[in-house]
C-alpha cells in the first residue's frame, strides 16, 4: 500500500506492535490461562515472553538488513527462494490478518453492546462489527502517519487503564495467592499454558510488515521489536499478579471471558468493572487498527511482488489500494458468517509455522545478516516444541480444530500450486528496500 511519505517514529512503531499484542487475548483468554496454569500464571507470561524474544532475535537481525512490507515472507524468500512453500506461507500470512480482523470485530461487539445496554441480537452485533471495521478502514485511507498517531493515543489510554489495574491491585494483593505452585502437575500446566499464551506476543511482526514506512528502519526496527515485547511482558505479568492476587483462581475461572473485569471489583469496585470494560474496547480497537494497517501492507506488497493477484495493488478510492478494502471486507465477512474460535486456533498454528521458517531463514542467511548460530538453533528447537505442544493441546481438546490445521495447510498448498500454474506469476526480486 503506497502510503504518504511521512514515516512512523520509533515510538509510533512500538505503539502499533503493543496495540496488536495487548489485543483481545489478555481480556478474552485470561480465564483459560488461569484454568491451565493456576497461580503460576505470571510465570507463564514470563515463559511465553521468552519464547517471543527468541523469535524476535531472528526478526531483528533479518529486519535490519531486509527491509520490506512483506515482512517475514521477504526473509523466507531471501533464504529459500521463490517456490511453492514461500508462496503458501505468504497466503497464510495475509489470511491470518483477515481472520484476526474478524476476531477483533466480534470481540468489540461483545464488549460494546453490553456497555451501552443495547440488546444483544444478530442485527446489533452485525451492525457493530461492520461499523468498527469500516471506521478503522477509513482511518487507514489517510496513510501511515494517521494510523501511527491514532494508535499511539489508543495504546496510551489502554496502558493507563491497565496501569491503574496493576497499581491498585498490587496494593490490596494477598501474597499467598501468588506464591508459585511447584507441584509437578502445576509446573506442567504452566509449560502447557505458555504454549497458548505465546500467541499473545505475536503482534510484534507488524513492525517488519511496515518497515518501509518506519524512520531509519535499520536502527528502529530492532529497537521497536524488543521494546514492544518487553513492555507487553511487563504489562501481562503485572496484570496477572494483580488479578490472581485479589481473586481466588476458582473465581477467575468461573468469570471466563470477563475475568479481568471481575478481578477488578475487589479493589476498584463497579468503577473498576467499567474501566476494564472500556480498556477492553480500547485494546480491541488498537489491535484492529494495527491489524488492518499491517494486513493491507502485506496484501499490497505481496501483490506487487507477484504472489497475490494484481488487483490487490491497484489504487482506487482515496488513493488507497484494493488490498486494503479486500482485507477489511473479508474480515467483516468472516465475522458475520463464522464462529471464530476454531479459526483463531488455526491462525495461531499458522503463525508458529511462519516463525519456524523465519528462524530457519536466519540460520541460512546468518553470514549475511549476523547473529549467533547457537542462539538460532536453540530458538528453532524451542519454537518447534511450543508448536508441537499447541498441536497436542488441540488434539486432546478439540479434534476438529486439529484436523482444520492440517486441512488449512494442504488447502493453501493446493491453491498455490494451481495459482502459479494458471497465472505464471512469480515473486519479484524487487520486494526488498536496500538499507
Swiss-Prot record:
Q: Give this protein's Gene Ontology molecular function annotations.
A: transmembrane transporter activity
Q: How does it sit in the membrane?
A: Multi-pass membrane protein
Q: Give the protein's recorded name.
A: Uncharacterized protein MJ0609
Is Repeat given among the entry's keywords?
A: no
A GO cellular component annotated for this chain's UniProt record is: plasma membrane
Give the intrachain disulfide bonds: none
Q: Which residues cross the membrane?
A: 14-34, 44-64, 84-104, 123-143, 153-173, 187-207, 224-244, 267-287, 324-344, 346-366, 375-395, 400-420
> Where in the cell is the protein located?
Cell membrane
Give the originating organism: Methanocaldococcus jannaschii (strain ATCC 43067 / DSM 2661 / JAL-1 / JCM 10045 / NBRC 100440)
Keywords associated with the record: Cell membrane, Membrane, Transmembrane, Transmembrane helix
**Known PANTHER family for this protein?**
AMINO ACID TRANSPORTER-RELATED, INNER MEMBRANE TRANSPORT PROTEIN YBAT
One Pfam match, given by its short name, reads: AA_permease_2
Keyword Cell membrane applies: yes
Amino acid at each position: 500500500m503506497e502510503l504518504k511519505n511521512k514515516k512512523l517514529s520509533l515510538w509510533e512503531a512500538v505503539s502499533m506492535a503493543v496495540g496488536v499484542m495487548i489485543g483481545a487475548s489478555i481480556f478474552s483468554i485470561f480465564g483459560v490461562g488461569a484454568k491451565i496454569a493456576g497461580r503460576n500464571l505470571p510465570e507463564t507470561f514470563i515463559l511465553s515472553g521468552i519464547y517471543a524474544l527468541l523469535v524476535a532475535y531472528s526478526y531483528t537481525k533479518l529486519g535490519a538488513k531486509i527491509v520490506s512490507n512483506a515482512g517475514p515472507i521477504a526473509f523466507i524468500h531471501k533464504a529459500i527462494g521463490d517456490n511453492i512453500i514461500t508462496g503458501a506461507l505468504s497466503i497464510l500470512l495475509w489470511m491470518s490478518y483477515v481472520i484476526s480482523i474478524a476476531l477483533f470485530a466480534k470481540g468489540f461487539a461483545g464488549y460494546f453492546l453490553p456497555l451501552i445496554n443495547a440488546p444483544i441480537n444478530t442485527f446489533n452485533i452485525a451492525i457493530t462489527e461492520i461499523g468498527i471495521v469500516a471506521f478503522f478502514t477509513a482511518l487507514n485511507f489517510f496513510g501511515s502517519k494517521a494510523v501511527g498517531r491514532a494508535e499511539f493515543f489508543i495504546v496510551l489510554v489502554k496502558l493507563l487503564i491497565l496501569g491503574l489495574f496493576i497499581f491498585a491491585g498490587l496494593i490490596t494483593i494477598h501474597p499467598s495467592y501468588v506464591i508459585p505452585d511447584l507441584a509437578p502437575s502445576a509446573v506442567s500446566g504452566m509449560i502447557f499454558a505458555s504454549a497458548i499464551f505465546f500467541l499473545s506476543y505475536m503482534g510484534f511482526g507488524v513492525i517488519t510488515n511496515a518497515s518501509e514506512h518506519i524512520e531509519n528502519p535499520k536502527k528502529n526496527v530492532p529497537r521497536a521489536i524488543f521494546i514492544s515485547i518487553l513492555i507487553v511482558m511487563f504489562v501481562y505479568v503485572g496484570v496477572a499478579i494483580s488479578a490472581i492476587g485479589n481473586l481466588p483462581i476458582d473465581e477467575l475461572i468461573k468469570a471466563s471471558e470477563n475475568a479481568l473485569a471481575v478481578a477488578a471489583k475487589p479493589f476498584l469496585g463497579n468503577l473498576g468493572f467499567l474501566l476494564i470494560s472500556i480498556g477492553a474496547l480500547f485494546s480491541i480497537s488498537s489491535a484492529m487498527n494495527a491489524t488492518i494497517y499491517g494486513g493491507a501492507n502485506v496484501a499490497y506488497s505481496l501483490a506487487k511482488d507477484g504472489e497475490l493477484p494484481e488487483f490487490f495493488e491497484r489504487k482506487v478510492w482515496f488513493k488507497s489500494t484494493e488490498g486494503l478494502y479486500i482485507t477489511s471486507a473479508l474480515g467483516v465477512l468472516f465475522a458475520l458468517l463464522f464462529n471464530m474460535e476454531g479459526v483463531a486456533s488455526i491462525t495461531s498454528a499458522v503463525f508458529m509455522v511462519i516463525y519456524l521458517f523465519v528462524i530457519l531463514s536466519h540460520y541460512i542467511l546468518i553470514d549475511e545478516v549476523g547473529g549467533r548460530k547457537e542462539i538460532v538453533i536453540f530458538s528453532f528447537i524451542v519454537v518447534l516444541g511450543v508448536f508441537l505442544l499447541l498441536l497436542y493441546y488441540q488434539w486432546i481438546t478439540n479434534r476438529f480444530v486439529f484436523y482444520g490445521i492440517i486441512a488449512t495447510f494442504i488447502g493453501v498448498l493446493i491453491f498455490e500450486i494451481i495459482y502459479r500454474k494458471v497465472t505464471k506469476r512469480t515473486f519479484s526480486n524487487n520486494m526488498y528496500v536496500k538499507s
